[in-house]
Amino acid sequence: MVKGLYTAYTGLINEQNRMDVLTNNLANADTNGYKKEGATSQSFNDVLAYKIKDTSESPNIAKKLGTMNLGVKIGENYTDYTQGSFRVTNNHYDLALSGNGFFSVQFTNKAGDISTKYTRDGAFTLNKDGYLVTKDGDYVLGTNGRIKLDPLQDFSVDSLGNISQNNRNITKLKITDFEDYNYLEHYGENYYQPVEDAKTKEADATVYSGYLEASNVQVVQEMVEMISTSRAYETNQKMIQTFDSTLQIASSQLGKV
C-alpha cells in the first residue's frame, strides 16, 4: 500500500514537471525563434515482490508473487528544433534563417565573462556605437568578430549572410551549425550553448532580410496537453487521498481487532 502511495507521489512530481514545460512554451509562444521543449518520463526499475510467512510452503522459501513497479521518475527535457514560420517585418535589421544553423552572439554575463551563444532570434538593431546587437544588447558576430555599420547609411544582407554597405562588402554573418543538437542546451531566455564534445559543422541556412522566424509553439496543441496533464495530476492527487484514508482506517481500527 505504501508503495502505491509512493507511485502516486512520483506521478505528481512527473506531471508537475510536464506542466512547467508546457507553461514555459505558452509563455514563449510569441518569442522570435523560440523552440518548444518537451518532457519525458521513465519508470523505475521493476522489483520482485515476495510472499512471506506462508505456512502452505516451506518456511525457508520465499514465494515470488511477480514484479512491482515503483512509479515514474522525471526523464529528460528535450528541445524541438523544427523551424517556425516566417513573418514579414520589412525591417532590414530583422533577419531569419531558413534551414539549419544559428546566429552567433557574443554574450557577457554579470561577472563579465565573455562567451559565444547561439540563437534563432534575428531581431537585431544598432547600438549607439554602431554595432549590430540583439534586443538584449549582445553583439552579433560576423566572421571577423563584432559587426560595425554606419548608422547613417543603408546596408543589405544577401542570402549567404554577406553584409554590404555603400557598395562594399563589410563582413559575413557567422552562422554556426552543429552535428548533433543533443549537445546543445538552452541558456537563458532564447540562447543555446554547446556542451562538452559538441562539434560544429558548416551551416546550410539561407538568410532572409526583413523577416523574423516565429516560435514553433502550437498554442492549441500545448493547451490540449495542459488539460491532459492537469487531469493526470488530479488523478494522482485522488490516489494519494484514497491511500491516506485507507492507511488512517488501518491504523485506527485494525488495531482493535
Annotate each predicted stretch with a short phrase.
Residues 1-257:
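Amphipathic alpha-helical polymerization modules
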